[in-house]
């Protein structure tokens, strides 16, 4: 199913390029959304581990939750920053016009 979505995105990038849009901007946004999704997927895994540890009621597992929750909190901060960077990149791409976008941007600097 992901492959079909990738194909559609690539086709949309090609169509936008034909219409004079900035395909580099869309590719950059797509790449950064995938980075955000990766962190969100990791958070889902962390939450499941925390739940499993909590349900086990074993002292060792409960103590592991401290580090897992700290990582989860750090990841939430990363996601907030990544979305902020995406917003800036997206706004710059549209307000600056296609000539004002350099294809890079701060959104690609965090992971």
Curated annotation (Swiss-Prot):
GO terms for biological process: entrainment of circadian clock; flower development; negative regulation of transcription by RNA polymerase II; photoperiodism; photoperiodism, flowering; positive regulation of circadian rhythm; red or far-red light signaling pathway; red, far-red light phototransduction. Its main location: nucleus. InterPro entries: EARLY_FLOWERING_4, EARLY_FLOWERING_4_dom. The modification Phosphoserine is found at residue 45. Component of the central CCA1/LHY-TOC1 feedback loop in the circadian clock that promotes clock accuracy and is required for sustained rhythms in the absence of daily light/dark cycles. Part of a corepressor complex consisting of ELF4, ELF3, and LUX involved in the transcriptional regulation of APRR9. Increases ELF3 nuclear distribution and localization in nuclear bodies. Required for responsiveness to continuous red, by regulating phytochrome B (phyB) signaling (including during seedling de-etiolation) and gene expression. Homodimer. Interacts with ELF3. This is Protein EARLY FLOWERING 4.
